[in-house]
Curated annotation (Swiss-Prot):
GO terms for biological process: ERAD pathway; protein folding. PANTHER family: CALNEXIN 14D-RELATED, CALRETICULIN AND CALNEXIN. Keywords: Chaperone, Endoplasmic reticulum, Membrane, Signal, Transmembrane, Transmembrane helix. The keyword Endoplasmic reticulum applies. It is found in: Endoplasmic reticulum membrane. It is a single-pass membrane protein. Disruption phenotype: Leads to a slight growth defect at 30 degrees Celsius and marked defect at 37 degrees Celsius. Leads to abnormal cell morphology of enlarged cells with collapsed cell walls and increased chitin within the cell walls, as well as strong growth defects at both 30 and 37 degrees Celsius when both DNJ1 and CNE1 are deleted. Residues 293-315, 526-551 are annotated as: Disordered. Residues 24-477 are lumenal. It comes from Cryptococcus neoformans var. grubii serotype A (strain H99 / ATCC 208821 / CBS 10515 / FGSC 9487) (Filobasidiella neoformans var. grubii). It holds the Pfam family Calreticulin. This is Calnexin. The lineage of its organism: Eukaryota, Fungi, Dikarya, Basidiomycota, Agaricomycotina. Residues 1-23 form the signal peptide.
Amino acid sequence: MRPQNVAGVAGTGALIMAAGALADQTVFHPTSLTAPFIEQFIESIPDSRWTVSRATKQTPVGDEIFSYVGQWEVEEPEVYPGIPGDKGLVLKTKAAHHAISTLFTEPIDPKGKSLVVQYEVKLQKGLECGGAYIKLLTDQQDEGLRAGEDYTDKTPFTIMFGPDKCGSTNKVHFIFRHKNPLTGEWEEKHLKNPPSPKITKTTALYTLITNPDQTFEILINDESVRKGSLLEDFDPAVNPPKEIDDPEDFKPETWVDEAEIEDITATKPDDWDEDAPMMITDTAAVKPVDWLEEEPETIPDPEAEKPEEWDDEEDGDWIPPMVPNPKCEDVSGCGPWTAPKIRNPDYKGKWTVPRIPNPDYKGPWAPRKIANPAFFEDLHPSDFTKIGGVGIELWTMTEDILFDNLYIGHDAAQAKKFAEETYHVKKPIEKEAEGSNEDELEEPSSLVEKVQLKVYEFLHLATFDIAQAIKQMPEVAAGLAAAVFTLLGMLLALFGFIGSAPTKVKQTTVKTKAVAPVAPAGEEEKKALDQAGVEIPAEGSKKRVTRSTKE
């Protein structure tokens, strides 16, 4: 073992021993830091400031059929536990809707300040299809904040931030809502090229920082993974373009936008042979001296034996399978030799009229620009609307997702110190418990689970963009549509809307054994079989010749 490897192993061992000793000495203590909002989930849900939603989710047609039946618990982690006594908010129910929220005693106003959002996620059973993001709920003094027992996916939010994974979706969301000052309408702004989340069973720390200079930064596990501008890196952009194409402007009929035209003066050269072949026989080629023309490329397998159950009367004459001729392995080739083909130097193909620059070409046409009547300019989108609370509203296929150590404030240095007290203490303990093995995330095993997961992936994508969901997973959309029509047809048939069933007529059929026709053997194959002493029935014979693979 090399000296540096010995040192590395010794260092790793020291870290593991230190982590184990740290776990023995460390117990959970609430932080002494103060910020606009800090949550460490010390109390059980009934005794805490958090309220589980009792609302129902509405379908697009207004039916209330999906309720938030997912259970929540405040408990210590079961997988790779960290600090003894440290609890978190755990999403407990698989394949269910969950919603829980809390309101601030005073709204948080980000105007003119930095905003820092930080929390931990522990995916104790991995993440098949679902999210682990949080929403900062919009303070609505005029309408009231629909949170608490009334909290739903329709509750307005100011910022949505956190990991999401399902099918092709695998990203850390950063979405903020912006109000159009002209129309008063709200529009979601989605981060372009978002980073990928950490899908592990140990704790991951997610941090979002926005600044008054309109910059932002996303950190995962205290490492920067994405930086950018609120004005430039979101879709759709905060500010619309100053100018737009004039919808009343049309391309003139005389506008020429064809850059090239055919040369009408060109004629086909007299020596242009359109019928010359592309490939010709190489007349200079010579047959290799070791080429065995009398030897076939394949021969009957000498090791093949007719199966004991083979019946010549029923199955036809048995013919052994063909194998490559071993005599041809170390020579240039076997069988009839033909000269190879080469490219014809006189080949020109079909003659076409050459193209020349168009003297009337004016270039590509574009409509003239006019002032955008919907233009406005907001140079400070970081002045988000006031935040009145925090909500977690998720639908996931994987249970036991743990949330802990939420921080919402204005001081990035304070958030980092909070992480040093919490995340950076538990992480080495978890890694020591995890050992040197990589996380083994559970995968769906049965066909039913796999189909169910595909359906959930489609529905998850549809919650953000139904058109994109159909585009990415057309087979699932078609399957769901077929299932709906099948169910509708069954219901109509059940109630007699399709008509009476036709009278069944008993039919008698006579079973006959089909005899497969025999394909005639090729000349080379006939030659090989003849050399092997295999008799080939003459045309018109009632027996069928059947090959068998080697048993």
